[in-house]
């Protein structure tokens, strides 16, 4: 009996033994198998479940909403303990809190978070002064600086024309917003920002970085490519960013107010070690081996000389990710034990396993399709013969 062909039989039992485990998270040997750029199968039951997050509530101009349960709250309207002046570490800010909002004291300087923040989803609400003064860039001007380097413009553009790449929600000096969705001055506006920093390695750009912005719920920056740190008057130049930096709010000489500021850290991209999405060949192979190792450990816990089936199925599942030699050998051993028992069954008990055996054929076909076992595996032919001998493929009239 060939080792690979023994392996084929093992999988049949997935239908019986693993049915309970897979009922809610999917089935093994179902969707397309892992490939050179995807460590997970399609509809992979072994893939980690998304974490649970309790959603917050939406804000209105009159009332701030509540952050989601996993948000890091930077300002809740009560204190500035997470903020400092941009002059140096530990220097207290001169900005003040009024009616649940922090307000810029003109010419007191920028304010920044004490902690450094990298890729994130950021929520911030701001309001220009109710009393309209100035025009163009001189009216209700401030800015939200991601990592202290990329400015998402804050400006009272309500009936106030200015240059396009300086409008509210512009990536300042780089890209105008898709729309002007501001409310009248004095009312709170909301920004929801998804920020991904540029990534460089050995002086080479791997990812330019991107930003998406919603202004009052309206998409105004659609996965906009970053061109480096923003600035005034000069063309931005791409370059490496640190992994994280402080969030800064600009003092541009106007008493702009901010409230309800929170963020959610984002997971790493594939290019920096993340395991979702389109991975490199090398990263995919490493992750597939890690997944297989976890499944093999799981299979070991199922060892039972009186019933080799559970361990057999789980171990076979690991081979879809990594055809480890020892795992193949152990799988063949378990398959032999199962097949020997199957061959000794009386006809009535064999008939009772019809659906299981037919499912096993499907599993064998899956493993052949994805080159886990050879097409001429002996057990595959044996299973087909059993099905043929009992006319199990014959449709009832």
Which ranges hold each PLM region?
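Bacterial N-terminal signal peptides that target proteins for export
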Residues: 1-10
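Compositionally biased regions
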Residues: 6-7, 19, 28
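A general, composition-driven signal for non-globular sequence regions
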Residues: 9, 15, 39-41
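Hydrophobic h-region of N-terminal signal peptides that target proteins for export
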Residues: 13-21
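Carbohydrate-interacting regions of secretory-pathway proteins
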Residues: 23-397
